[in-house]
């Protein structure tokens, strides 16, 4: 007798072992038809999985997030099936699920073209309509490797040969195609109805640039056509908002091959940067942080003591001078500990909050670089709080409130919070972890925030809160973190004198709100589509003269506004006013101030707001008041 507990708490009993599909059928024909897989005692399995013991089971359908993952994984295999049918000489490698879709890497003697993608997608549709059953069999490692070598699939054989001999190997087949995979997969190809191939890109075998170059075909798959249409529309919008395009269009920054992963900020882009940095500086100062500055290059011995040299060296830029090894800092924390250690600290000094707009460098792979979003040189709005264990909750509450307020000010209202909990391998006692995790929970609760818990995802030295902001297109970006660290103060010898005169280690809270300034600016540019709020805009207004006779008035007006602390320029070129208006409209300037003879004589301005809104003619003082009101409403 096998007893199976369902999500509603009911228990079904079966005389003999049953498959997930059979359980679904016993519940109802509709569920049997909709079943894509099952969650057996928390593990995702195929509908063909046999249950021979008492267990809990949830039937997975296309209404579940896991169901969509199964569909995408199976569509990646369908892609490989179609490619092998159309291009038998192509060799298959790997095909995982990624955000919003999947990809599959192929080795082929010529590049795949857009026309090839159309043919492949059409063949995928034909194969899906055949509704061929997807079957699974478990074989030994040697049998699997031998099979793939016999059909000339050297990459698959190499993957299998790297797997421990004792491991079971799963092979999935549909039609004439067999692939190595951990699964699970849909029960038949007819479940795959909504998909599209997106693009081809280069990739290296096993992600190593020393290996052969492969071709990576990206695709997307969904349960409903409306969802796919919405996603494709979002991609169109994202392309229009691409910060790399807007950076060029708005003359904010550029990047070039002579300095890969580093940013050349232009005057307007640097003005935007300064607004963000000055705002963040004001907020951390108000929150009781002390701003410091630490060296960019430090001796190897410090990085060895912190553990970075042993565990992070390949991502660090290193140099040598006078027979000493140095590294450019990839992060600011070891330097902050040195400031804390400089002098005797008392419990009365705690909490001690150090902030730094710290310039860091990481040796990211060139293929991973992506505009401002993934760079090698970046500045973090970094800070470290040194406190006692009893102060963790209060400091976490204060940080949560600060972070949420900052995100709102920048126009982000939807924040997802995730709490990463203890991993299996960790330092510290269970009691210490209990207190640390519960402290972070209490801090989130005190702020009225909801969160998702991620068991096992914390660092080995402490739990962590992550802040994921959603932009105007619904995309999620992780920006802020609050990481509790029980290790670094010990490794680097940080201590304070407790109330009983004993020496104790402080708890260290690593925290950032925007994270990488470069990346955050990229997110801001895309979120606002380059049309920055007035308080952030590099140029808040441009004065445009219609003819030569208004040049002096236009210059005087711009200077008057600049003296009020406003970011205003004058465009005095001998061009048609319609041309100048169009140009500055494309630059997304919040206000255009047009002056002709009438405005000059009356000491007024004709004001056009962003979006082509005509605000009419008004005295200069009235416009200044309007702009100041925009700024006051933000503050």
From Swiss-Prot:
Entry-linked Pfam families: HGTP_anticodon, TGS, tRNA-synt_2b, tRNA_SAD
List residues of the TGS domain: 1-61
Keywords, sorted A to Z: Aminoacyl-tRNA synthetase, ATP-binding, Cytoplasm, Ligase, Metal-binding, Nucleotide-binding, Protein biosynthesis, RNA-binding, tRNA-binding, Zinc
Q: Which residues form a coiled coil?
A: none
Q: Which reaction is the catalytic activity of this chain?
A: tRNA(Thr) + L-threonine + ATP = L-threonyl-tRNA(Thr) + AMP + diphosphate + H(+)
What residues bind Zn(2+), as annotated?
A: 333, 384, 510
Q: What is its EC number?
A: 6.1.1.3
InterPro entries per the UniProt record, alphabetical: aa-tRNA-synt_IIb (IPR002314), aa-tRNA-synth_II (IPR006195), aa-tRNA-synth_II/BPL/LPL (IPR045864), Anticodon-bd (IPR004154), Anticodon-bd_dom_sf (IPR036621), Beta-grasp_dom_sf (IPR012675), TGS (IPR004095), TGS-like (IPR012676)
Molecular-function GO terms, alphabetical: ATP binding; metal ion binding; threonine-tRNA ligase activity; tRNA binding
Where in or outside the cell it occurs: the entry states: Cytoplasm
Assembly mode: Homodimer.
UniProt similarity note: Belongs to the class-II aminoacyl-tRNA synthetase family.
Function of the protein: Catalyzes the attachment of threonine to tRNA(Thr) in a two-step reaction: L-threonine is first activated by ATP to form Thr-AMP and then transferred to the acceptor end of tRNA(Thr). Also edits incorrectly charged L-seryl-tRNA(Thr).
Q: What is this protein called?
A: Threonine--tRNA ligase
